[in-house]
Amino acid sequence: MSEIKLIVGLANPGAEYAQTRHNAGAWYVEELARICGVSLVPDSKYFGLTARAVLHGKDVRLLIPTTYMNLSGKAVGALANFFRITPEEILVAHDELDMPPGVAKFKLGGGHGGHNGLKDIIAKLANDKNFYRLRIGIGHPGDKNKVSGYVLGKAPAKEQELINAAVDEAVRSTEVLFKEDMVKAMTRLHSFKAE
């Protein structure tokens, strides 16, 4: 397995979106930055908030695109190209409708599952889908016509607690990833379910 050199948290920019379900990926990167003791700062060259962190002696770039979600690939492509980071060295954290709140899972490759942020990243990486994902469960509204309003809405307090617990566990599992390997990180994270 390649070492992860770039961790991306997907989000929509602006205060009105900060607490919406669609921004779960950004919550994870913000927490990772906090435990690494680094500040995410705006960088127009990479169309996002970026930081350089060190996790268990390994350098990693953190990125939260500040474009809208459906243009996330612009930021990821710009930073990956500049630092010559390959898709296999990228971990993208995003909200996942097909998993309940309180659960998060790592995954390598796959499609975009209708997620516009992932769709744009795949396009900007020359259709290479072979990057890692951290899927953060937000649950599903039960009707595909309600998805847009659902992801752009705030979770009720109990659901938010579950999502936050999964994000915290994902951060701890990321430390395992950098200290040991992806298999151990997956084993830890995939056995977790906040109640």
From Swiss-Prot:
Catalyzed reaction equations: an N-acyl-L-alpha-aminoacyl-tRNA + H2O = an N-acyl-L-amino acid + a tRNA + H(+)
Binding of tRNA, residues: 17, 68, 70, 116
Localisation per UniProt entry: Cytoplasm
Keyword Acetylation in record: no
GO cellular component: cytoplasm
Protein task: Hydrolyzes ribosome-free peptidyl-tRNAs (with 1 or more amino acids incorporated), which drop off the ribosome during protein synthesis, or as a result of ribosome stalling. Catalyzes the release of premature peptidyl moieties from peptidyl-tRNA molecules trapped in stalled 50S ribosomal subunits, and thus maintains levels of free tRNAs and 50S ribosomes.
Name by which UniProt lists this protein: Peptidyl-tRNA hydrolase
Organism from which the protein derives: Shewanella sp. (strain MR-4)
Gene: pth
